[in-house]
Amino acid sequence: MKSNSIITFVLLVCFSLTSVAQSTVDDPEIKKMLAEVKSENMEATVRKLVSFGTRHTLSDTKSNTRGIGAAQRWVKSEFDKYALASGGRLTSVIDYFTVKADGRRIATDSQLGNVMATLKGTDPTDDRVMVISGHLDSRASDVMDAKSDAPGANDDASGVACMMELARIMSQREFPFTLIFVAVVGEEQGLYGAKHLADKAKNEKWNLIAMFNNDMIGNSLSSGTMLRDNTRVRVFSEAIPFLETEAEAKVRKSINRDNDSPSRQLARYIKTVTNQYVDQLDIALVYRNDRFLRGGDHTPFSQNGFTAVRFCEMNENYDHQHQDVRKENNIQYGDLVEFMDFEYMKKVTLSNLASYSNLALSPKAPINVGIEVKDLTNFSTLVWTAPAGKPVYGYNILVRETSSQHWEKTIFVKGTKAEIPYSKDNFFFAVQAVDELGHSSLPVFPLPIR
């Protein structure tokens, strides 16, 4: 009887795999949103931000034509336009806060302000929150130079334009939980705007399930090596969580979970959704929190225990990054609009929109996800508890070999327990909840159950 049941289950698994492949269809509403992304809109946003001369965090706040203050007010005015089409659900604010002089990149006590739009969810019982950001500030060669031109077309008007395009499109629709779109400041001076928002989320106990940081997504040509790559974008994610208790570390080490942090699961999620919805763009999963010895606005969120990733172009051009605008030895330096690849930037924005909206429409993730370890067997039994809230149609069990970066197999099941013919010695697993339209939650890595 046991052998017959195993054979039957294997056949069911094979059938499930076939069924999933046949039934994976694009959500027409997400496809409609993607069709509304316009590279000319984002180019206009980038050019407008560049027109403010400099957006240095400590630059002029009074002028209406130059400096960070003018840029902040313009972004808010755009958010206010989007609000008109939102049925009153989108609201915007410049969230001012004070940063004390730090002896490094903040010379005197300064008032900074993140420009934030909040799209209120339609389900009052769903307390989830997501954040997407780009940083509004720019810099010249000298990080303390608040006077010289610092156009910041790519770093990071590109990320702000991406975020604003999502705000424009998504504010016309309804989503069950709250979505936040924010142009943070103080990035170049020490991630101050992101830290302020991350601390706010922690102190106010937000149920923040994901944070998308877009920083430099509009350049496709590297300096020096002269490599042009407009078909890949890097997504950075932390390996071992910044916040990890001694007990959690002990479990992680015992099951070799070093590459399965929640942030890394988000990165894989983005890759899966991008493969489904976006042509000619591959997500390059980079197994580090950020570039070598560098940081970004997702980092304060990770440090506060939130799931966060960074989108960044595949190859950076250091002639156009943190440079005074000048020409030397026939080389044009400076972060100018003329060096932008807006079609590449559009594809990265499509990836953001597909992933952000798919997750925004998803059911909550399964809870108490575990893998039974009471018996030695070449089968693996996973169990979990159904989440509260939005109805769940079923669950995806994700499977990959231990040496693989990305999930390789998807097994769809309807219950909350499944025995699958894959050894826990040779494979990693995760479970995600799925609704009837295929919107899936973030994957949850199982913990051992004895």
Give the residues covered by each predicted segment.
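Alpha-helical metal-binding/catalytic segments enriched in His/Glu/Asp
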Residues: 117, 132-133, 137-138, 142-191, ...
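Metal-dependent peptidase/peptidase-like ectodomains
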Residues: 184-296
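Conserved aromatic anchor
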Residues: 378-391
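Short beta-strand segments within Ig-like beta-sandwich modules, predominantly Fibronectin type-III
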Residues: 408-415
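Beta-strand-rich modules
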Residues: 420-441
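Active-site-adjacent mobile loop/cap segments within catalytic or ligand-binding domains
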Residues: 50, 217-238, 285-363
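N-terminal capping segment at the start of a domain
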Residues: 23-67, 320-321, 325-332
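A non-catalytic alpha/beta surface segment that caps or lines the substrate-entry region
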Residues: 44-120
